[in-house]
Regions:
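SAM cofactor-binding core of SAM-dependent methyltransferases
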Residues: 58-131, 135-136
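Active-site flanking residues adjacent to catalytic metal/cofactor-binding acidic residues
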Residues: 82, 108, 151, 178-180
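Conserved acidic residues
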Residues: 79, 147, 174
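C-terminal substrate-binding/active-site "lid" region of AdoMet-derived donor-dependent transferases
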Residues: 155-222
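A short acidic, Gly/Pro-enriched loop at the edge of an enzyme's catalytic core
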Residues: 141-148
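Membrane-proximal basic amphipathic "stem/tether" segments
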Residues: 1-52
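Glycine-rich phosphate-binding "P-loop"
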Residues: 44-59, 148-155
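Distinct, well-ordered alpha-helical segments
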Residues: 93, 142, 159-163
């Protein structure tokens, strides 16, 4: 019982270090609700098709997160994008890339069959399926930095093992987005891992909370 109390107190301390979304807006990217709403309106037809024909809504990234990511990319003008856990995020990144010259996208998955399914979905919408790697292929690649990294790989029990790797793949001026932090054990592990790092952590709940109570965190270097 004492260990549970200590863990709970430690968890509260860790959560107290998470900065509010208003700080993210003011200090990094002024992504306003209007920007996110416009992005959601743009993405919604594609999203509804995706959760009807490709993946269940509770397994796919939320429309809220998709809209935020798209709006953030547009606001910051990112040129290098990485998503771990291919799917609708791979579509969002490539849709943005198709509208902006010189954007490079890399999508990674630990399920080769699902990666092929994502490729098919991209081709269906006239988007390139280049830059799609299995997790093993990605881990064997030379270290590369990305402006925007979305870590949504597999289930959180697997995902936690690669937080350090994706943090290393995030550019100094870039952002790492960690989804599904509504799960207390995962959130605790993430915050405990990051407490020794020179990072700032921001609560994206106000702009990414969905009907399943899922939401995300943003992590900035320095």
């Amino acid at each position: 019982m004492w260990s549970r109390i200590v863990r709970k107190l430690n968890f509260l301390k860790l959560k107290s270090g998470v900065l509010p979304y208003t700080r993210f807006e003011n200090e990094y990217a002024p992504v306003m609700q209007e920007d996110i709403s416009k992005a959601a309106q743009k993405l919604k037809p594609y999203y509804e098709q995706y959760i009807t024909h490709v993946s269940r809504a509770d397994m796919a990234m939320s429309l809220e997160l998709a809209a935020f990511v798209y709006a953030l990319c547009a606001k910051k003008g990112y040129k290098t994008l990485l998503d771990l856990g291919s799917g609708f995020s791979s579509f969002v990144y490539r849709l943005y890339a198709s509208e902006n010259i010189g954007v490079q996208v890399l999508s990674v998955d630990d399920d080769a069959q699902w990666l092929e399914k994502t490729k098919g979905y991209l081709r269906q919408h006239g988007l390139p399926d280049a830059g799609m790697l299995t997790l093993d292929q990605f881990l064997q690649q030379p270290a590369t930095k990305f402006d925007c990294v979305l870590h949504d790989l597999n289930f959180v029990e697997v995902r936690i093992n690669y937080v350090q790797r994706v943090l290393e793949a995030t550019a100094n001026s870039g952002v790492l987005i960690l989804d599904d932090v509504h799960k207390p054990d995962y959130l605790y592990q993430v915050l405990d891992l990051l407490k020794q790092k020179s990072v700032s952590i921001y609560d994206l709940k106000p702009v990414t909370l969905d009907s399943y109570n899922r939401y995300a965190l943003a992590v900035l270097q320095g």
